[in-house]
Amino acid sequence: MSMRAPQLDWLRPGQGSGLRFVTAIGIVAVFLQVTLIPRFDIGPFAATPNLVVATVVAVAAFRGVVVGAIFGFTAGLLVELLSPGDTLGVLAIAYVAIGAWCGRFASGSEPIGRVTAVLLVVAAAALVPIWLGTVGLLRGEGPPVGYLLGHLVIPQIVLAPLMALPAWWAARRLLGAPREVEPWLVPT
């Protein structure tokens, strides 16, 4: 029994809502982040490039605020569940804010180019350690501000462009042109 072309439309990248590919991109990004991406130790700086932040920015830019926020929450929660950490949900909240913010930024009249995407990833990657440090300070166990900025934020800013373009390319290839997707609305 052979399948006709219309039955295979959901397998083609860029067709439909792309939510299957959003799920696949998220699972691959979280898996790579938790297992394969190396930790760089350069002098006093030690950091791991954040592929999940770059993927959240790319998905939010191509699918809008709602999908970006939901994707950010689930990716952040998966990273927290799969890697050792202390407080569950802190990273997920940061990724929700990043997904919603980047989705809102991308919903303008002009499509986002590669340079703007890299700048968004750099800004988002810098916000994650600031957020984690702020939550740590509120709990009374965070790092000093100088250490936070000098040893946590700057390495993320330097390493973020390494992850930005591969994540952007994968999202563009699999999701197609940017468009708003509301997952719970049924087309009429």
Task: Describe the function of each predicted region.
Residues 1-188:
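Terminal, non-globular segments
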